[in-house]
């Protein structure tokens, strides 16, 4: 890896004596892992690795997968979660932040999300809480927001930093009102509802466009 920040990573892939530089237009270490897998698959099927690396540099995120919105000059990034492994990867990314940020979690237990939410106790929330003042505020939503609030309380988050916001439009406005970069971590159905709200009220394209 050459460099990495909250927007992208620059990496060099090596294959024997050959090297291929690419810009991964998504932050997070797990996106670098995905890019490595892409290069490996390309090599396995005999593709030109220079072409593969250039294609990686042209890649744009899918909806909800590190998708970025800017509202009133406040950047919001939506990061879909499905399980504790993926959630911990998101937290790994967040703990690299060097400026204060707002964090939002939208936890739902609809059929597409999975009914069992006990996995939130396998997520290293404590590591996030230990960031201190860098973790400026935590906003919670989704139909299981109360359980997520309990998880943060057990992790030691001061109560004054914790806020449950039931309505997704109110949640979006609360994220923007903090005037700091905001990272939103929704489960699948919460992501669809939240993204629809953002598109409708703030002029962004629907996810299928």
Language-model segments: residues:
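Generic structural motif
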Residues: 4, 16-18, 27-29, 83, ...
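Surface-exposed loop/turn and secondary-structure junction residues enriched for glycine/proline
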Residues: 5, 25-29, 33, 69, ...
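Extended acidic/charged loop-beta regions that coordinate divalent cations
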Residues: 1-21
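Glycine/charged-rich beta-loop-alpha catalytic/anionic-binding loops adjacent to active sites
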Residues: 15-24, 69-74
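Structural beta-strand/beta-sheet cores of well-ordered domains, especially the beta-sheet scaffolds
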Residues: 9, 20, 37, 62-64
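A conserved, hydrophobic alpha-helical segment in the catalytic core
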Residues: 20-57
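ATP-dependent carboxylate-amine ligase
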Residues: 43-49, 54-63, 68-209
């Amino acid at each position: 890896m050459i460099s990495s920040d909250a927007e992208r990573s620059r990496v060099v892939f090596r294959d024997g004596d050959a090297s291929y530089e690419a810009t991964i237009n998504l932050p997070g270490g797990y996106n670098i892992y995905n890019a490595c897998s892409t290069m490996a698959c390309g090599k396995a099927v005999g593709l030109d690795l220079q072409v593969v690396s250039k294609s990686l540099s042209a890649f744009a995120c899918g909806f909800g997968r590190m998708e970025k919105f800017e509202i009133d000059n406040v950047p919001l990034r939506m990061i879909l979660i499905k399980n504790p492994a993926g959630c911990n990867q998101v937290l790994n990314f967040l703990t690299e932040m060097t400026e204060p940020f707002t964090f939002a979690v939208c936890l739902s237990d609809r059929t597409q999300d999975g009914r069992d939410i006990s996995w939130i106790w396998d997520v290293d929330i404590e590591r996030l809480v230990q960031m201190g003042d860098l973790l400026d505020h935590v906003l919670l939503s989704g139909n299981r927001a109360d359980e997520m609030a309990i998880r943060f309380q057990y992790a030691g988050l001061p109560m004054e930093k914790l806020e449950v916001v039931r309505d997704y439009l109110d949640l979006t406005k609360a994220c923007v009102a903090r005037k700091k970069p905001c990272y939103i971590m929704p489960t699948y159905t919460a992501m669809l509802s939240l993204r629809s709200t953002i598109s409708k009220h703030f002029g962004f394209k629907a996810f299928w466009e």
